Curated annotation (Swiss-Prot):
It is found in: Cytoplasm. Its main location: cytoplasm. Signal peptide: none annotated. Transmembrane segments: none annotated. Inhibits RpoS proteolysis by regulating RssB activity, thereby increasing the stability of the sigma stress factor RpoS during magnesium starvation. It comes from Escherichia coli O127:H6 (strain E2348/69 / EPEC). HAMAP family: Anti_adapt_IraM. This is Anti-adapter protein IraM. One of its GO terms (cellular component) is cytoplasm. NCBIfam families: PRK09919.1. Keywords: Cytoplasm, Stress response.
Length: 111
């Protein structure tokens, strides 16, 4: 079954991601992976993770719940990533980030 990613939020201090996905039902999944699931991407589940862009990527899924707008807004409002800011310097100022590579292309600010 193919799943379409609607939205994704990353909590970089713990490496957990949350995504709204849709196939025949809209769900919220929270997971840990080196893979970033950008909006509009399409993936399928495998026994070892997900198939995204013709690559099998390991994913640990912690929970899946039916989509709830209030719950999703709570997740989005607690987001630690500065993805929606007008960051002219292209730098991340989140000193607690554990991600090796920023999925948004930001560079870690030096202390």
């Amino acid at each position: 079954m193919k799943w379409i990613v609607i939205d994704t939020v990353i909590q970089p201090s713990c490496g957990i991601s949350f995504s709204v996905i849709w196939s025949k039902i809209k769900l919220i999944i929270w997971y840990q992976s080196d893979a970033f699931l950008p909006p509009e991407s399409i993936f399928t589940l495998t026994h070892t993770g997900i198939m995204l862009n013709n690559k099998v990527l390991p994913v640990t899924i912690y929970n899946v719940v039916p989509f709830n707008k209030t719950f999703w807004n709570l997740i989005k409002n607690s987001q630690e990533c500065p993805t929606n800011t007008d960051n002219v310097l292209n730098e991340c100022f989140n000193n607690r980030c554990t991600l090796q590579i920023c999925p948004y292309g930001l560079k870690q600010q030096s202390p």
